[in-house]
Structure formats: C-alpha cells, structure tokens
Amino acid sequence: NYDQNTKEKTTKPSVRYAEGQSMSAIWAVRSLGIDPGTGNELFLTKDGYLTYTWDSDDQIVCGDELPKYTGTFGFNLDWKGFSVNTSFYYRLGGQMYNQTLVDKVENCDMNNVDHRVYTGRWTTPGQKAEFKKMTDPNYFTRPTSRFVQDLSELQMTSLNIGYDFRNCKFMQKGIIERLKLSFYMNDVFRLSTVKTERGTDYPFARSFSFQLQATF
C-alpha cells in the first residue's frame, strides 16, 4: 500500500512493492539535473515530458539496492617466522540513494548547515551547479534520480600480522619454548564509488589489538 498522502510528504524513497519489480528497487522521479538558467531542478515525467514540478505519480524505478555480485576473499602468507592473514569483502553493481547528502545540503536545518549549502548550490544564471537554488519552489527535495548513485566497494575487513621468534638465537637457550607477537586490525579500509557520509549513523567500528603469546 502506498497512499497519496505518503507520496506527497516523503523526502526519501519509500519501500514499494510492485508486480514484476525488485523488492529492493529505488523509486524516484527522473532528474535531468539543475537547470543552469533558473537554478531549479528539471524533471522528466513518466511520459517523458520536461517539468519543474515534482509529482509523486512520475516516480519510476531508478535503481536497485541489491548488488549484482558480492563475495569475500583473502590470503595467507608465512615467511621466515612472519605471517600475514587478510580478509576482504566486495560488492559490485547496484545503487544507493544518498539520503545523508540530501539531508545535509538541500533539506538541511538552516541553523546547522554543511559548507556545500553555500559553495555547491546554484546562485547565478548560467552556473552549472550540483545542487539547486535555495529558493526553488520545490523547497524540500523529494525522491529524485539525482541522488541515486552506483555503488561498488571493496573492504579490507581484517588484517593479522604476526612474528614467531622460534628461529631467534635467544630462543635456543631453552628458557622460553615459544614466543609469538601478533597484531590484529578490523575494518582496515573501504574503497567505494560513493563517498559515504555517516550522518547520524554509527561510525565505522575500526579496532586493533596486540597479542603476545609465550610458552615456557
């Protein structure tokens, strides 16, 4: 169910289930970007006509959050007492709606704004801008394909580096049977086609630790 009241008030893509469409489809009105002459956003109706007016009935599927491919891989290396173990995660294909970017720039609280409110928005006729003018008649930015972005990413989810001192000369004295030093880190890095903005979401939980194992 997707009633008219919800369609007109929402500023983010709503979950919609339509026959023959993906359950993770992103519904929005197609956008041609910001008109350099007026600073208003230029839309395409579902029939292909140009308009400055956002209409909920013109929403179509503009992307899908479900990636085409996902997977994990890693490698292990042991050499002269050194060991390296890594794990990676990847996703290819699919899209995301960059809602945080919308909320920080075009739907922002004017008492707490992002610098792009002043540097990235349209101000002068003929200007090519990423964001619409502040006096756009469609004041609140509603679901638009302008913020649907292709998402592919690679994450290094864990890294473990260790050194086993078993071949060191001091180990031959027999006081210590085994000694190994290890370093562990998770969420090492993320490479993404979308500049992810956390907003009020939890930050990426990167952590690291050292471990010393000794056997006497």
Where would I find each of the regions flagged by the language model?
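Flexible, surface-exposed loop regions and adjacent strand-edge segments
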Residues: Y2-T11, G94, L101-M110, V194-F204
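Outer-membrane beta-barrel "beta-signal"
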Residues: L159, F204-F216
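Extracytoplasmic gating/loop element in the C-terminal half of outer-membrane beta-barrel translocons
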Residues: Q21, A25, P36, R91-L179, ...
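Outer-membrane beta-barrel pore domains and translocons
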Residues: D78, Y89-R91, Y184-V188, T215
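Membrane-embedded beta-strand positions of outer-membrane beta-barrel proteins
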Residues: T86, L181-F183, L212
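Repeated loop/turn-to-beta-strand initiation elements of outer-membrane beta-barrel proteins
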Residues: G81-N85, C168-F170
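Conserved small-residue
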Residues: N1-E65
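Outer-envelope beta-barrel architecture signal
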Residues: Y69-G71, K80-F82, S152, I175-L179, ...
